[in-house]
Amino acid sequence: MNMAQLQLKQSAYIKKVNGTGSLRHHLLDMGLTKGTEVTLQKIAPMGDPIQIEVRGYELTLRLAEAALIEIENIHQRQLVDKVEPVRYEPVPHPGMGELGQAESYEAHAKAPVLPKGKKITFALAGNQNCGKTTLFNQLTGANQHVGNFPGVTVDRKDGTIRNHPEAVVTDLPGIYSLSPYSSEEIVTREFLLQEKPTGIINIVDASNLERNLCLTMQLMELNIPMVLALNMMDEVRSNGGSIRINMLEKMLGIPVVPISAAKNEGIDELVSHAIHVARYGEVPTRIDFCPDNEGQGESLGAVHRCIHAVAHMVEMEANNADLPVRFCATKLIEKDAPIEKQLDLPAEKQEAFEHLVSILETETGLDREEAIADMRFNFIESLCKKTVVHPHESKEHKRSVQIDRLLTGKYTAIPCFLAIMAVVFLMTFNLLGAWLSDLMEIGVDGVINLIDAGLTAWQINPVVHAMVVEGVCNGIGSVISFLPTIVTLFLFLSIMEDSGYMARVAFVMDKLLRKIGLSGRSFVPMLIGFGCSVPAIMSTRTLSSERDRKMTILLTPFMSCSAKLPIYTLLIAAFFPRGYQAVVMLGLYLLGIICAIGYALILQETVFKGEPVPFVMELPNYRIPSAKSVVRLIWDKAKGFVQKAFTIIFVASVLIWFLENFDIRLNLAASTEDSMLALLGSVVAPIFSPLGFGDWRISTALITGFAAKESVVSTLTVLLGGNADQVNNLFTPFTAMIFLIFTLLYTPCVAAISTIRNEMGGRGAAVAVVVIQCAIAWCIAFLVYQLGTLAGLA
C-alpha cells in the first residue's frame, strides 16, 4: 500500500521511499525515512495535493509523489493530552565561548587566532521559514523583507553586524539540505564551498529540532567554525516545553545559543559566541553521527565503517579540490553528481568505492541514500529524546488548524480566496487607497502652486519656469499622487504573505495550475507580480525545476504590477462612472490572468513540454504579521517609488518637456506640432492607428512607459499642458479601454526586463519577452477594437 491510499486522519509507518533522482533524495532529507510515522491531515479542495504530518511538522505533496512512498501498519493515532512537562532549565546557557569546555574546543582549532579587527565573514544558514531573515535584520539593522512563506530569501544578502564593523554576515536562501535539489540550495552550497566563510551561524526552529538538525549535521561536516542559534525559544517556553541547552551542546560539539529573533532576545550572546569561534577557528568537535559503539545496531556500524573508508580513500582528491573530506565522503555515498564530477575518482578508486557501497547496502538492507538519511535521523531522534521536553500542542498550531478549516476547507477555500482578493481590490481602488490618493493629490497640487507662485515672484526666466512647473512638478506630481494606492496594495499583499496565507493559496491552487503545466509554488511569484514584477521574477528561484522557473518568469508580466495603477486610475476615473470603476479594474486584472493561462497552454505544448515540478512544500503555522515587518516593507516600497519618481520619472519628464518645447533646430517650437517630440511620435503613431489611438502623444507616452510604467501618466500630463484631466481630449471611453488593455499586456519596464535577462541567462530571452509581450498586447487590443467596432461601440 502507498501513502496516496491513506484515508483522512489515518496514520502509518513508512516502509520504503521509491523513485529516483533529486526528488527521492529531497523526500529523504525532509525526514521521510523508513519507520517514520506519518498522518494524513488534509486533502486539498480539488482532491490533490495532500497535507501530512511528519516529524512534528506539516508537509504537502501531490498524490503522484505520495504514491512513491510505501507504507505499512495503518492505524488511528492516539492523541493523548500531554501533562505539564518538567522543565530542564537549571542554567540558561553555559559560559562565554563555552569557557567550561574551552579546552576541548580549542583543541579542534583549525587555524591561528585571527587578530582583533581582522575581517570575519559569516554565513547565516537554516531551513526555510525558521526566522533567518528576521535574525539577519537584528544582526545588521537591515530591512530585508520578512515573510511566512517557504523561500522568502531568494538571493544572498550581505550586511555588517552592528557594533562589529569587522564582521560581515551573508543571509543565504533557506534550504533543507546541502544536496542540489533547487536553485536556492545550489546558491547556498556554492557560497559555503567556494567562498569559505570564517564561520557559520546555523539558525534552527527550536519548536521543531527534528526537522532542522538534518541540515545542521551536513553543515558540521564542512569543518567550518559554527554556532547553533535556537530560534523561537519564547514559543517553546510559552507552550510548556524546554530544551537542555548544555546537553544539546555537548552532544553536537558546537556552541548552542537560545534566542528569539523576533523579540531580539539572546542576539548579543549569539554574536559574541559567533565571533569567538570564528576568531579562534573552533570547528565542530563531532562530525561522526554513527553511534555504533552505543548499542544502537550493527546497521549503523556499517554506515560508520563505509563513511570512514570512503573518506580515507578520497582524501587526496578532496584536498586537491579544496573540499572537506568528510563532506565529500557522505555526498559521494549519496550519489551527489557535482561532487562526483569535482573529485573525478580514477577507475580503480571508483571500483573500490562501489564495492564499499555494495557492502553498506547489504549490511543495512537499505540503499545508499536511505542509509545516510537513516543514520542522520537516528542520531537526531536519539539527541531529541535526551535534550527536548516536548511542549503541549502549540497555540500557533491549534490556531492554524482552526483557521485552515475555513481557508483550506473543501467548499470554503476558493470562495474565501475570492472574497479576500475582492476585499483587497475594494480597499485599494475604491475605499482606503482612493481616499488617500485624493488627499495626496490635494497636497501635491498645493505644493506645485506654491512653487509656481515662488518662481513668479522671483521673476525666473519663463522657459526655466515652464520647465520646472510644467515639466518636473507636473510630471512627478502626477505620479506621486498615486503613491497611497500602491502602498495600500503592498500592505495587503504583505499581510497575506507574513500571515502564512500565501502558502495555503499555493496548496489550494496546485491542481488548477497543474492543468497549465505549473505547480502551486508558481502561484506565489505570480501573486507577488501584482505588486512588482522584479521581486516576483526573483522569487522564482525557490522553484526546483528549471522548466517551471522559466515558464513562471514568462507568465509573471501578465500579472498587472502596481506601477500600472496610475495609468488605470487616471483613465478609469476619467471615463467610467464611480460605481463601475472597481469592476473595470477587476476586469483588467482578470484579462491579464486569462491571457497568462492561454500563453501557458501554448508554452506547455511547444517550448516547455513535460511535467510540472513535484509539489513538496512545508506549510508554516499562521502567525500574526509583525507590525514592524509590515511597516518596513511599506516604507521600502514607498521609498523605492519616490526614488523612482525623482530619478527615472524626473529625467523622463524633463526630456519630454524639452522635446515637446523645442524643434529639431533647438529653437522654441511655435506649437507642439512643430516639436521634436511630435516628429518622433508621428513615426510610431501609425503602429497604433489600427487600435484607435493614433495620436502621437499617446504613442510617445507608451514609449516612455518602457523605462517606468508610471512615466506614461507623467508624459501625458506634460503633453497635456500639466492638466491630466484633459485626457478626455485624447480618448473616448471605448478607445480608453483599448489603451488600458494594451498597457496591461505590453512589455514590462526596463528593471523587469533586466531581471529577466539575469534570471534566464541571456539577452536573447529579454529581447524575446519584449517582442512577444508587445505582439500579444497589439493583437489582443486589435481584436477587441475590431469586435467593439462591429458592435457599434466605436
Q: Can you say where each PLM-predicted feature lies in the sequence?
A:
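Extended, low-charge hydrophobic alpha-helical regions
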Residues: 363, 370-374, 390, 431-472, ...
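Juxtamembrane inter-helical linkers in multi-pass membrane proteins
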Residues: 442, 446-450, 503-533, 609-633, ...
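Core alpha-helical transmembrane segments of integral membrane proteins
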Residues: 407-507
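Hydrophobic core segments of alpha-helical transmembrane domains in multi-pass membrane transport
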Residues: 416-427, 489-494, 572-575, 589-602, ...
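Transmembrane helix-loop junctions at the membrane interface of multipass transporters and ion channels
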Residues: 562-586, 751-762, 783-794
